[in-house]
């Protein structure tokens, strides 16, 4: 996430230990951090940031105000991965598919392997058919592998603890196909998997 809290399109907050760094120092710290992860975990896949629609490590990597610095940070992270592994696949992760074509055009010259998409019906549309078309377009236009990096679907709308349900209403669901039941949850995941793996570049 490159943050002390959740990173998503609405917030990409610098880790507190990096707040005093200038841009060049931040790049080096990012490189060192990713290198440490690569050495300790040896991952098969790695994301450079989480849901980076609007950038990373604000304000330095804000796409709107600092697009060139955003690309520098991403490329620096990619270099750290490539320096330690020729097999680890690099994911660039976008939330939803609205504006995804624009984003992946922006990063077209970045050396990455996989387009990662978040898909939550509540926020990103309630049609698996539309999702299928969007994933196909991304695959064809950019020639990258495709995966669903984040998703979730409830098996109940019941309030069974003291934590608020993010998805808690019928209007958040894909009905009548996928009710909030164990079977509805299972069928949603099954059909989503079918959509992704139905693409020649779909990996999961």
Regions found by a protein language model. Name each.
Residues 2, 6-14, 157-169:
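Short, flexible, mixed-charge acidic loops at enzyme active sites
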Residues 6-110, 124-133:
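Active-site cleft segment of glycoside hydrolase catalytic domains centered on the general acid/base Glu
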Residues 145-158, 167-204:
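Substrate-binding cleft of secreted/luminal carbohydrate-active enzymes
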Residues 44-47, 87-91, 112-116, 145-148, ...:
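Structural preference for beta-strand elements that scaffold enzyme active sites
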């Amino acid at each position: 996430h490159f943050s002390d809290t959740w990173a998503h399109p609405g917030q990409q907050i610098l880790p507190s230990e990096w707040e005093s760094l200038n841009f060049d120092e931040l790049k080096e710290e990012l490189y060192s951090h990713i290198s440490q992860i690569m050495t300790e975990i040896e991952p098969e896949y790695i994301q450079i940031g989480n849901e980076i629609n609007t950038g990373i490590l604000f304000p330095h990597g804000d796409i709107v105000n600092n697009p060139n610095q955003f690309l520098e940070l991403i490329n620096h992270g990619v270099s750290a991965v490539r320096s330690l592994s020729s097999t680890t696949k690099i994911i660039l992760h976008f939330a939803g598919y609205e504006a995804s074509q624009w984003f992946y055009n922006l990063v077209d010259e970045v050396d990455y392997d996989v387009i990662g998409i978040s898909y939550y019906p509540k926020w990103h549309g309630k049609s698996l058919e539309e999702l299928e078309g969007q994933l196909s377009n991304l695959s064809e236009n950019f020639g990258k592998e495709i995966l669903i990096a984040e998703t979730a679907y409830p098996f109940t709308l019941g309030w069974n603890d003291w934590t608020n349900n993010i998805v808690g209403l019928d209007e958040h669901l894909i009905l009548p196909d996928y009710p909030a039941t164990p079977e509805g949850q299972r069928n949603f995941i099954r059909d989503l998997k079918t959509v992704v793996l139905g693409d020649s570049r779909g990996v999961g």
